């Protein structure tokens, strides 16, 4: 529920910031989800990354205003979410974005902007052309399209295309510090983990987040 997520964000966002990492918060068809995320980031002094879905223009810019009010220093959009089955045919609609549309969004927020869901070198170059500060190489856990390659398979080619020109992050099955090391060796500048931190914050709150981060750093 949105209330449950709001409670999680209240614990997750400051706990991650205190552990020296940044929490990416989510978005959904229920507008309260993004509102709760923005509120949690605002309460943590802007130390979190609000991640918005590729909605229609009016919905998107209203959500961007909410995120701007939080004081967030970095924004993100999971561009591949346009293909999620649960967003199909909904109001508000979500869909793909052109380079020009992304450029307008990035110029509007006036802070570094990450585009999540990039799986090709061509997509990475388009993100760079749009003015993105970074990308997240991600297949959305395989939930957008069947048969997509693993992120580790496509990461080297993407790194060859844009390494040094923008920040390259990657997610997908990263569970240990050794996995982090592999991602860095394949060309990433950093990684994202979702499920382990969800488990940590539910099971141990801020202490769970701290211990997991400490464990990953030690393994790395």
Residue spans of the language-model regions?
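Single conserved hydrophobic/aromatic residue that forms the stacking wall/gate
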Residues: 1-9
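PLP-dependent amino-acid enzyme catalytic core
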Residues: 7, 14-18
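Short, surface-exposed connector motifs at secondary-structure boundaries
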Residues: 17-23, 43-48, 106-112, 162-166
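A gly/proline- and charged-residue-enriched helix-loop-helix capping module
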Residues: 18-56
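Alpha/beta enzyme core
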Residues: 55-170, 178-182, 186-200
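Short donor-sugar binding/catalytic loops of nucleotide-sugar-dependent glycosyltransferases
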Residues: 174
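Short beta-alpha connecting loops at secondary-structure transitions
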Residues: 198-209, 220
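N-terminal pre-core extensions flanking Radical SAM catalytic domains
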Residues: 214-220
């Amino acid at each position: 529920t949105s209330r449950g997520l709001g409670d999680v964000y209240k614990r997750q966002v400051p706990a991650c910031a205190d552990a020296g990492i940044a929490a990416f918060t989510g978005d959904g068809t229920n507008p309260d989800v993004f509102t709760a995320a923005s509120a949690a980031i605002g309460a943590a002094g802007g130390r979190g990354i609000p991640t918005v879905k590729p909605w229609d223009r009016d919905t998107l810019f209203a959500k961007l205003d909410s995120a701007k009010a939080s004081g967030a220093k970095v924004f993100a959009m999971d561009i591949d979410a346009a293909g999620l089955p649960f967003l199909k045919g909904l109001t508000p609609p979500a869909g793909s974005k052109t380079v020009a549309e992304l450029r307008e969004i990035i110029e509007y927020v006036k802070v570094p902007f990450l585009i999540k869901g990039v799986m090709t070198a061509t997509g990475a170059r388009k993100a760079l052309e749009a003015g993105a500060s970074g990308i997240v190489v991600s297949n959305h856990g395989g939930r957008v399209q069947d048969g997509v390659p693993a992120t580790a398979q496509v990461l080297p080619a993407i790194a060859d295309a844009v390494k040094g020109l923008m920040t390259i992050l990657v997610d997908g099955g990263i569970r240990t510090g050794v996995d982090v090391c592999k991602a860095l060796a394949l060309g990433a500048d950093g990684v994202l983990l979702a499920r382990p931190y969800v488990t940590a914050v539910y099971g141990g709150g801020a202490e769970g987040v701290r211990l997991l981060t400490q464990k990953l750093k030690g393994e790395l």
